[in-house]
Amino acid sequence: MTKEVCSNIGLWLLLTLLIGNYVVNLEASHHVYKRLTQSTNTKSPSVNQPYRTGFHFQPPKNWMNDPNGPMIYKGIYHLFYQWNPKGAVWGNIVWAHSTSTDLINWDPHPPAIFPSAPFDINGCWSGSATILPNGKPVILYTGIDPKNQQVQNIAEPKNLSDPYLREWKKSPLNPLMAPDAVNGINASSFRDPTTAWLGQDKKWRVIIGSKIHRRGLAITYTSKDFLKWEKSPEPLHYDDGSGMWECPDFFPVTRFGSNGVETSSFGEPNEILKHVLKISLDDTKHDYYTIGTYDRVKDKFVPDNGFKMDGTAPRYDYGKYYASKTFFDSAKNRRILWGWTNESSSVEDDVEKGWSGIQTIPRKIWLDRSGKQLIQWPVREVERLRTKQVKNLRNKVLKSGSRLEVYGVTAAQADVEVLFKVRDLEKADVIEPSWTDPQLICSKMNVSVKSGLGPFGLMVLASKNLEEYTSVYFRIFKARQNSNKYVVLMCSDQSRSSLKEDNDKTTYGAFVDINPHQPLSLRALIDHSVVESFGGKGRACITSRVYPKLAIGKSSHLFAFNYGYQSVDVLNLNAWSMNSAQIS
């Protein structure tokens, strides 16, 4: 550890002590209460840490939630995040700050933004970074004022020559945007400003999540100088009945290829670009997106046919995943997606272990060639952690009811890629017309239920005798009798993940838009208490949190399996043990 990093940690701890003396407690639901209760935990984390991850981002201790303001500046990646310096539960929120040169290994810095003025004295909530045309980064974030109103503030670096951006200052003009009697904004539901974009009229635009009664909406503000903002008469988009829109994100994607697009770009001509509007629904705690067209004249987002911005929209991730945020990586011409994964353990367990929350591995995100969905894939940099590759698992036949153990890999901290080939598609069961909810299907037809084709996939974090395991698998159905159209279902079944009873063991599911006549790919990033699964080369993603009692460390096992009636071929299986990332 460098002298500079040690100094940073010292400053971080000093600020933590100072901050802890006056920051108020807030509840995790984002409600602010006049009478606050003690919800902090000051004891040291438990020495026994079987569930702490090896290569996912998480601070040394305490609560973490939303990723904030990710960006690249002078070749350095920055990740800010919502952090409680006083305990492993939500409250006392500040903007913690870490930097990296590769998105995998991270060094900490003192908190960048913390309550210090009337416009944020009751909390510094989520926001985003924008790189101005002169290369200067600025942050817009939500502050909680003395009246517990949500207002929007700006902060900028004190020293632009510092690539680590270790010190930030707040504008005396704050708050820049606030609810009042004229604009009629809901003062308790006005938060999480996006990265701003520059229109062709040279005005900046930013959207902020809000609601009016049950109408969720993205309020638009415009500005000529990034300091004086004016509310637009109409929102960028809204939906009646969806409830509060948190952590909105709005960005362009190219229709051709996987390269990213700068947020203010409109393409030449505009037809080569589409736009993505993503929201985090407070009611469901899931992230949804729609693909559509941005009307630059009316400042309106128009979803493509088949898309609706509500709970029926496609999701980034069908598991434990929320409050996501993208940024354009100008160094590698890609768009990167961050997302927060909360715990599935009890609050008491979180307090005992001394921490709560991780960030998923950053993902490259782009538009599928069909134009109907987004593709996600872990950034290439994570592959540098691969070691001890298991090879030559090719052309294996998995007969009905069989398992194939993968030896020679550290199964509790691994990266696995497998390619399946299905035989006899005509043997698939017919899906019931009422089966429209993939999670419900996966829950009712868990891994022990046989069907014509499936379940087949991977058993991860498994104990030797299968008292515990998490299964990630496919099933294939016919769309209807005598049909040559098929439905591919992907499940992540946590029901047998732990002998411990008080964990959330929800089973997750997603339909995968792929052709089952072609090989089916499945990738799993396994990291002690988290499993990130990518089906169909990133067309469906499911993140799970699990806490085995037996299948920990060297006692964890990995299997490929087929419990369907028909045989399945493993065309190729590669597995790697993963080194730990350097995350301080």
UniProtKB/Swiss-Prot annotation:
Stretch forming the signal peptide: 1-28
- Superkingdom of this entry's organism? Eukaryota
Q: Which GO molecular function, any one, fits this protein according to its record? A: beta-fructofuranosidase activity
Per the record, the similarity remark reads: Belongs to the glycosyl hydrolase 32 family.
Q: What is this protein called?
A: Beta-fructofuranosidase, insoluble isoenzyme CWINV1
Protein source organism: Arabidopsis thaliana
Identify the enzyme class: hydrolase
- Catalytic activity, reaction form: Hydrolysis of terminal non-reducing beta-D-fructofuranoside residues in beta-D-fructofuranosides
Q: What GO CC terms are in its UniProt record? A: apoplast; plasma membrane
**Which keywords, in A-to-Z order, does the entry hold?**
Apoplast, Cell wall, Disulfide bond, Glycoprotein, Glycosidase, Hydrolase, Secreted, Signal
Q: Which residues form the active site?
A: 66
Query: Which GO BP terms apply?
Result: carbohydrate metabolic process; defense response to fungus; response to wounding
> What's the Enzyme Commission number for this chain?
3.2.1.26
**Changing residue 90 to L: reported impact?**
Loss of activity
Q: Which residues bind substrate?
A: 63-66, 82, 90, 125-126, 191-192, 246, 282
Q: What is its main location?
A: secreted
Q: Which gene encodes it?
A: CWINV1
Q: Please tell me in which tissues this protein is expressed.
A: Expressed in seedlings, leaves, flowers, and seeds.
Query: SUPFAM superfamilies this protein is in?
Result: Arabinanase/levansucrase/invertase (SSF75005), Concanavalin A-like lectins/glucanases (SSF49899)
Q: Which CDD domains match?
A: GH32_Fruct1-like
Q: List the induction conditions.
A: By wounding, aeroponic growth condition, darkness, sucrose, glucose and mannitol.
> Which locations, inside or outside the cell, does it occupy?
Secreted, Extracellular space, Apoplast; Secreted, Cell wall
- A matching Pfam family: Glyco_hydro_32N
Q: Which cysteines are joined by disulfide bonds?
A: 442-491
Q: What is the lineage of its organism?
A: Eukaryota, Viridiplantae, Streptophyta, Embryophyta, Tracheophyta
* Residues with glycosylation annotation: 159, 186, 342, 446
Q: What does this protein do?
A: Beta-fructofuranosidase that can use sucrose and 1-kestose, and, to a lower extent, neokestose and levan, as substrates, but not inuline.
